[in-house]
Amino acid sequence: MLTSPRLILLLLAWVFSALVASALVKKDWTITWEPGAPNGQERNMIKINNQFPGPTILCDEDDDIEVTVHNKMPFNTTVHWHGLERVNCVRMMGTPWSDGTPGMSQKPIEMGQSFIYRFKASPAGTHWYHSHSRATVLDGLYGPIFIRRKPDAPAPWHLISKEQADIDAMSRAVIDPKLVMVSDWTRFMSWEYMAAEESSGMAIFCSDSILVNGKGSLYCPDVDVLINHTSTYMKYGLYPRQVNDKGCFPFMRSTQGPYLTTGKPETIPLHLQHGCTPAEGTNETIEVDPADQWASLNFIGGATFKTIVFSVDEHDMWVYEVDGHYIVPQRVNTVHMYAGERYAVMIKLDKTPKDYTIRVADSGLTQVISAFATLRYKGGIQGSDSVGVIDYGGQNSTKDGSVITLDREHLPPYPPNPPARKADAMHVLSTHRWKSAWQYTMSGHGMYEEDRSAYGPLLYDPHSADAMDEGLVIRTKNGSWVDLVLQVGSLPGQPQEFPHMMHKHTGKTWQIGSGMGIWNYSSVEEAIAAEPHNFDLDTPKWRDTFVTSFDGSAWIVLRYQVTNPGPWLFHCHIETHLAGGMAIAILDGIDVWPQIPAEYGPDQRGFMPGTLPELESGGKQGTVDKQCPLLAVSPSGGPKKDSGETSASDSRWETLIRGLIQVLQGWLSDEASSRSS
């Protein structure tokens, strides 16, 4: 038990360290619904401060982030911070109220409302943010996050080059990367896309364009060209059918299961699945200075359902970071990237100064489609041709087939950080379609409805009926090690499923094993004894997004330690699969549930009691009836005259005072408990 003087000294030390070690990064975002044409084809879309993709959050590790979101759209929204842990330094307590997941950590941000998200910039690396309300990622609410590491963080540059000049150049490049956000785009609004799936009963994977940093075009090559660029694997699977004029694949059993014969594809609107109309937009140009010697390109998988492969003409890529964490670098020519994933690559700037094409294509699983960007050497020849290693369909285009692709199964973290050798609990999840081709269950016990608990978030009542549903909710204890076994292809007659990109909110997990067939083990230890070649407990992948197999019945085993109590969504990151019910809730650390600050009470939205902005309703087609007031919160809880008058130091003290109050409340609670016992 701490004495009062000792407690005061610790609090003062904490205040001092917080002041000197981190900065406050404040963002004020207005989210609107307005016309845009990122691929040359106009439609209404989501913008943040009139930008698409949204503004980049650039900060240093452990900075305090505060993002005030004003919803001026005619529908609800939230913002999720993908890859961030929502960990706070206050009594090792997390910030689950800022996760941005309706039904879990907050209520939806309604039309005309504002919400303040506050969290630590942790962990370092490449991340992104996106909407988590319905399927509106399809409408454009997303943007990049980059968190610079501390200067003394171990780095793997010596594994790429032994030359000190190269190591120094890479050390400079990593703190000023070129962010490359890759997304897919369609002329149809998210609700129109989902309505097409529901009415047809089909799982649809067709897009109009792939965008690079929000730019691209709608290409319509001849069908013969599209057929020629279809992968051999897909040609075999499609025979005797073939791709259509959009490069989209016909519906088949591997993607529709037994519901192929009962679907109604004729109800799908023209231009969604077929009917290509070209539109010309612009392509992204990324300029690099050859005097820098090396450049870091940080790719972000913001696609909603596309499986991407990318390359840079005439340049090898050293993959050194995966989902924000360093790995033992791999030298490659191509990288396959799935929804939600991030890959940072180093490239040496030692080629002839000119333009080189960055090729971004569907890997061949859902569509024959491509996008292009330009890597431009400063002072070089513009508009010049370059030689690629993949074609329009994302397939190997070299004469000798000598293309090195990232080995996704072997991504040892750098430095090594192996998990515990044994877990305390195991949960087996049977993931499969649920009564239709486009609806899914992640648990095997039912769909997780996209609006489930939206106005009764589990954070505020972890013992509600929704929170106690054992078919859709996992409950864990703080500090315990948990194994999640994901089984696909377990239903009779449905051995094959489209790959699912599984993402657990708040932090990374280890993939310690994977194998083909049906999981029939009572424990992971039993499985390791039977199939030791399918497990790795020494250098397993450590990331926040994992991909299941497309090759038939298969399983993967994920292991993590519960260190951040709160309600977290675990779901497939294919946006249409999530909207179709592919999720579960994990209530981590149910035995030490977080104390919720007053400003994050059920209806406070980050504002102290008594300072909430007046609720105003949104209008239609990107307009609102009135402007929402922008309101900053002072330490006393009263409103300031104008948010622009709030200095960083004022807000820093605001944060510190809030933290001190929470520490004191916790200490007093501990004191009372110890005295009563």
From Swiss-Prot:
Cu cation 4 binds at residue 503. It is an enzyme of class 1 (oxidoreductase). Pathway: Pigment biosynthesis. Transmembrane segments: none annotated. Residues 1-23 form the signal peptide. InterPro entries: Cu-oxidase-like_N, Cu-oxidase_2nd, Cu-oxidase_C, Cu-oxidase_fam, Cu_oxidase_CS, Cu_oxidase_Cu_BS, Cupredoxin. The keyword Metal-binding applies. Induction: Expression is regulated by the aurofusarin biosynthesis cluster-specific transcription factor aurR1/GIP2. Cu cation 1 binds at residue 80. Disruption phenotype: Impairs autofusarin biosynthesis and leads to a yellow pigmentation via accumulation of the intermediate rubrofusarin. GO terms for cellular component: extracellular region. The keyword Amino-acid biosynthesis does not apply. It comes from the Eukaryota. One of its GO terms (molecular function) is copper ion binding. Residues 31-150, 179-379, 469-588 form the Plastocyanin-like domain. Keywords: Copper, Glycoprotein, Metal-binding, Oxidoreductase, Repeat, Secreted, Signal. Cu cation 3 binds at residue 132. Glycans are attached at residues 76, 228, 283, 396, 478, 520. Cu cation 2 binds at residues 82, 130. Might be part of an extracellular enzyme complex composed of GIP1, aurF, aurO and aurS. PANTHER family: LACCASE-RELATED, MULTI-COPPER OXIDASE. Belongs to the multicopper oxidase family. Multicopper oxidase; part of the gene cluster that mediates the biosynthesis of aurofusarin, a red mycelium pigment which is acting as a mycotoxin. The first step is performed by the polyketide synthase which condenses one acetyl-CoA and 6 malonyl-CoA units to form the first intermediate, the cyclic heptaketide and yellow pigment YWA1. The C2 hydroxyl group in the pyrone ring of YWA1 is probably formed during ring closure by an aldol-type cyclization reaction. This is Multicopper oxidase GIP1. It comes from Gibberella zeae (strain ATCC MYA-4620 / CBS 123657 / FGSC 9075 / NRRL 31084 / PH-1) (Wheat head blight fungus). The lineage of its organism: Eukaryota, Fungi, Dikarya, Ascomycota, Pezizomycotina.
